Swiss-Prot record:
Keyword Ubl conjugation included in the entry's annotation: no
Main localization (coarse): cytoplasm
Species: Rattus norvegicus
Molecular function (Gene Ontology), one example: zinc ion binding
InterPro entries: M14A-like_propep, M14A_act_pep, Peptidase_M14
Classification via PROSITE patterns: CARBOXYPEPT_ZN_1, CARBOXYPEPT_ZN_2, PEPTIDASE_M14
EC class name: hydrolase
GO CC aspect terms: extracellular region; extracellular space; transport vesicle
EC number: 3.4.17.1
UniProt name for this protein: Mast cell carboxypeptidase A
Length: 412
């Protein structure tokens, strides 16, 4: 009997043998509509932009397709003389290649590797044990599947001070994002009293860090489907699972009719803040609004530093200020390994998005909100090899420290 029960529970992980990732450069309207038409009959998983309705002329589009459909795609692209390349020839091979750093000690958490959720949970406990005067863990809520949502507060325990809220892993498959949040907490706590800048920052401000926003989705991307993006909530009247948490915030939530299909990876959910994860974060930020002066969210991939707005091409009142911070922050980032980032408002730099955490935080009154799209530019996409984690974290750390110094000096 146990065998029967077990086999129904254990859905085998999705295999991606010989699936391909294409990159297509769209020259004109005709080519854009050819690509859009393909999606009527073939299921494409968009890597960049996030969804079919974001496609526009002169855009470079990355998407994943099954081995079976890749022939059709290729012949259509060639027939219409479209400019394309195959970024990834065998997705499963690329997935296996991510883990290119040897474990020092089997089963132990490592900053040089991707860590699954269980390792991250025990890591949060260890950080508090190791730095009790500097790190505390706050449970801000739980997920649909009843996993805890933990924020780590870093900073001196006494008194009210300015704060920065940071989150990672709102999209499950963007693994390098939670890796950065872990690195940040580790570096901040460990360098207090040793590194001059970090010590000054932590003496005068707090950091609230949510290492994994979309815990259920993250677990699912480890155990069942590496390409999963959304959370894992059930949708009424649909067999399709999950909401895109970064379309679920109460800011211009219903302005994009294209995000109301539960089967899409950018599904906005049945209502603004319908998701437990979103609600936990918004409640926490609202209750600390007096102190939170900046909000930073980490995604991958494409090497960009973005700021509001996403839902409109209108520029926010402090646009010049945000532009200046982003310009210097990307300069600082490139000083380490010459990694080039582009920067600008979401809507004009990439495409319009509605219901995002960034715009929500800004309209709530947090006047410095930024989204990092971490490495790379598409060679590995979401499957950045582990050997790139540390360089990515080190360069991003410089950038975040600059933003924090700026916030300390220039906000009231």
């Amino acid at each position: 009997l146990m065998g029967v029960i077990y086999s129904t529970l254990a859905i085998a992980p999705v295999q991606f043998d010989r699936e391909k990732v294409f990159r297509v450069k769209l020259q004109d309207e005709k080519q854009a509509s050819i690509l859009k038409n393909l999606t009527q009959t073939i299921e494409l998983d968009f890597w960049y932009p996030d969804a079919i309705h974001d496609i526009a002329v002169n855009m470079t589009v990355d998407f994943r397709v099954t081995e079976k459909e890749s022939q059709t795609i290729q012949s259509t692209l060639e027939q219409h003389k479209m400019d394309y390349e195959i970024l990834i020839n065998d997705l499963q091979e690329e997935i296996d290649k991510q883990f290119d750093v040897k474990e020092e000690i089997a089963g132990r958490h490592s900053y040089a590797k991707y860590n699954d959720w269980n390792k991250i949970v025990s890591w949060t406990e260890k950080m508090v044990e190791k730095h009790p005067e500097m790190v505390s863990r706050i449970k801000i809520g739980s997920t649909v599947e009843d996993n805890p949502l933990y924020v780590l507060k870093i900073g001196r325990k006494d008194g009210e001070r300015k704060a920065i809220f940071m989150d990672c892993g709102i999209h499950a498959r963007e693994w390098v994002s939670p890796a950065f949040c872990q690195w940040f907490v580790y570096q901040a706590a460990k360098s207090y009293g040793k590194n001059k800048i970090m010590t000054k920052l932590l003496d005068r401000m707090n950091f609230y860090v949510l290492p994994v926003f979309n815990v259920d989705g993250y677990i699912w991307s480890w155990t069942k489907d590496r390409m999963w993006r959304k959370n894992r909530s059930k949708n009424p009247n649909s067999t399709c699972i999950g909401t895109d948490l970064n379309r679920n915030f109460d800011v211009s939530w219903d302005s994009s009719p294209n995000t109301d299909n539960p089967c899409l990876s950018v599904y906005r959910g049945p209502a603004p803040e319908s998701e437990k994860e979103t609600k936990a974060v918004t409640n926490f930020i609202r209750s600390h609004l007096n102190s939170i002066k900046a909000y930073i969210t980490f995604h991958s991939y494409s090497q960009m530093l973005l700021f509001p707005y996403g839902y409109t091409i209108k520029l926010p009142p402090n646009h010049q200020d945000l532009l200046k911070v982003a310009r210097i922050a990307t300069d600082v980032l490139s000083s380490r390994y010459e990694t080039r980032y582009i920067y600008g408002p979401i809507a004009s730099t990439i495409y319009k998005t509605s219901g995002s955490s960034l715009d929500w935080a800004y309209d709530l009154g947090i006047k410095h909100t930024f989204a990092f799209e971490l490495r790379d530019k598409g060679k590995s996409g979401f499957l950045l090899p582990e050997s790139r984690i540390k360089p990515t974290c080190k360069e991003t750390m410089l950038s975040v420290k600059f933003i924090a110094k700026y916030i300390l000096k220039h906000t009231s």
